[in-house]
């Protein structure tokens, strides 16, 4: 994320806000995975009038799982946010795939509510809290799962040095711009 920020800030008029730099919630309340922390990050993006919200992650599963995924908003409720998110997700994944990160059945994805949560118009809501919350605030959000930290090959090829991390960050930035 920090390398992406550095690359984005080379462009005039681009302001990047980082909502965390450690595993603790910068807004209090414990883990960054907590509902409260996610809500506060979404609120922060609204308060700074963000144009986009990008959530950086590494996936984890069994040792054979590989590949890149970028989640974006569904087309329900505020479909323009979904369309903008889809364009952004496709641009980012194109750059990451160009680095050699496989898709292996992943790619650009929508994840809908698994417990029938609905938007105000009655349509099925997005599952991911930062995507759903930012949609309410008219901010396209994507969540990037760069590769699998649980896969030795992914770790060696894409995560094993600062230069490799920088390459990921530059690819993310180029997809965003």
Regions found by a protein language model. Give the residues of each.
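A structural motif corresponding to the C-terminal end of an alpha-helix
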Residues: 4-12, 95, 99-100, 130-139
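Acidic, glycine-rich loop-and-strand cores that form catalytic or ligand-binding grooves
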Residues: 79-80, 84-115
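Stable alpha-helical elements in mature extracytoplasmic
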Residues: 4, 34-41, 84-88, 92, ...
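Hydrophobic anchor at the start of a short beta-strand
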Residues: 15-16, 103, 141
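Catalytic-core regions of hydrolytic enzymes
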Residues: 1-87
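Active-site-adjacent mobile loop/cap segments within catalytic or ligand-binding domains
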Residues: 55, 59-61, 109-177
